[in-house]
């Protein structure tokens, strides 16, 4: 159970998983332990999980999902009444000073469950970093004070259930966050979510007997990107046989944040020792001067090497085609060290991973960050890599619907 005694009557007393906890204010009074021990409380556990897109661009909207669940193992008093979720959006970001450059809950937007718009209340943290919860009460019947950063948003989402028990399945609540175009690339902006019950284990809602309950706060650190890479190949099912008879192509795509300009962009593809480079099919950059100079080229007779291009500038549209590099290759039978990629007579396999990266110069429109910055792609982004399996023999199986192509129905004739 994630809920603790101290966070039932004061949200300020609970600790997010990776945040510092502010001191209690005079209005945030924990209840004496003996009163809690006299009643069966905390049985209804409000557990949440928070996920969002990890590689979102400056100025983009991010789709978040909060998964709410009652994970109580108590066999009796385990029902929570009037469930809700508190979401804190880091609207201010790096401010003060202005402008705000974080992630906001867009004006006029709402949270939803299964396509149903939910009742959503927005409260702005005041100059003291306090927000009065719209309905949660403490043991004295007073509104719960939620602590946060002055100017950030508290978004309270009421779930469409009168009660919620541990036998009910987890539910997903969807909402959107808008990343400021003035945000700093690769800087973590924390979005948090906390589950709760307006009435702990009693539908009557007498505040002196049944005040609000809160679960553990979950943090999702969102790191906006100036640009993101996407690496693909036309190998069927991510596998190929070795040798020059089985040629394929890699495609390296880059999306640059809308309206942002990257200068002196260097795009690099590092070929593994098992991959033999053949030739470039196409190279392009939005608003780049052509021809785009090649700064490094792999050998066409020996596997491995580095393929690089230098773009004087790229103006972003947010499309994956802001930059595109396509080149042909095959998996050699022997690697750059003269060793068999797949030893003869073994009939084995080998996983081969190809990596791409990019570095460029960029100046923010945010007056608080006037200095030109060197920005690099996220090396841990799995989308900038492509893994394939080399085999001595690679087989694929497909089919064609001869009766209703594209609209399969029972009884159709299928050709494999």
PLM segments and residue spans:
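Subset of Sec-pathway N-terminal targeting signals
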Residues: 1-44
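Exported/extracytosolic protein signature
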Residues: 43-416
């Amino acid at each position: 159970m994630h809920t603790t005694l101290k966070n039932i009557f004061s949200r300020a007393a609970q600790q997010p998983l990776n945040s510092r906890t502010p001191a209690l204010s005079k209005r945030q009074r924990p209840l004496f332990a003996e009163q809690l021990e006299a009643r069966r409380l905390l049985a209804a556990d409000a557990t949440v999980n928070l996920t969002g897109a990890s590689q979102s661009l400056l100025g983009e909207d991010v789709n978040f999902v909060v998964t709410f669940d009652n994970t109580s193992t108590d066999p009796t008093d385990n029902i929570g009444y009037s469930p809700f979720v508190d979401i804190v959006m880091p609207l201010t970001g790096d401010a003060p000073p202005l402008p705000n450059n974080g992630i906001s809950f867009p004006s006029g937007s709402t949270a939803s469950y299964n396509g149903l718009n939910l009742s959503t209340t927005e409260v702005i943290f005041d100059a003291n970093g306090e927000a009065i919860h719209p309905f949660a009460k403490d043991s004295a019947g007073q509104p719960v004070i939620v602590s946060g950063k002055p100017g950030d948003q508290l978004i309270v989402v009421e779930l469409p259930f009168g009660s919620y028990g541990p036998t009910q399945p987890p539910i997903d609540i969807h909402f959107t966050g808008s990343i400021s175009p003035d945000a700093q690339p690769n800087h973590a902006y924390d979005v948090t979510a906390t589950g709760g019950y307006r009435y702990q284990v009693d539908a009557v809602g007498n505040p002196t007997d049944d005040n609000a309950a809160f679960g553990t706060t979950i943090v999702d650190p969102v790191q906006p990107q100036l640009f993101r890479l996407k690496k693909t190949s036309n190998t069927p099912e991510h596998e190929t046989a070795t040798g020059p008879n089985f040629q394929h192509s890699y495609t390296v795509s880059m999306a640059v944040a809308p309206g942002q300009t990257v200068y002196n962009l260097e795009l690099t593809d590092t070929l593994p020792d098992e991959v033999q480079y053949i030739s470039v099919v196409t190279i392009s950059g939005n608003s780049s001067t052509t021809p785009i100079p090649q700064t490094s080229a792999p050998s066409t007779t020996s596997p491995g090497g580095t393929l690089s291009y230098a773009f004087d500038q790229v103006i972003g549209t947010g499309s994956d085609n802001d930059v595109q590099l396509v080149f042909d290759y095959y998996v050699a039978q022997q690697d750059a060290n003269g060793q068999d990629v797949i030893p003869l007579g073994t009939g084995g396999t080998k996983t081969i991973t190809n990596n791409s990266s990019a570095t460029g110069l960029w100046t923010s429109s945010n007056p608080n960050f006037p200095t030109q910055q060197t920005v690099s792609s996220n090396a841990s982004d799995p989308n900038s890599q492509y893994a394939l399996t080399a085999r001595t023999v690679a087989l694929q199986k497909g089919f064609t619907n001869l009766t209703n192509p594209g609209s399969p129905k029972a009884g159709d004739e299928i050709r494999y």
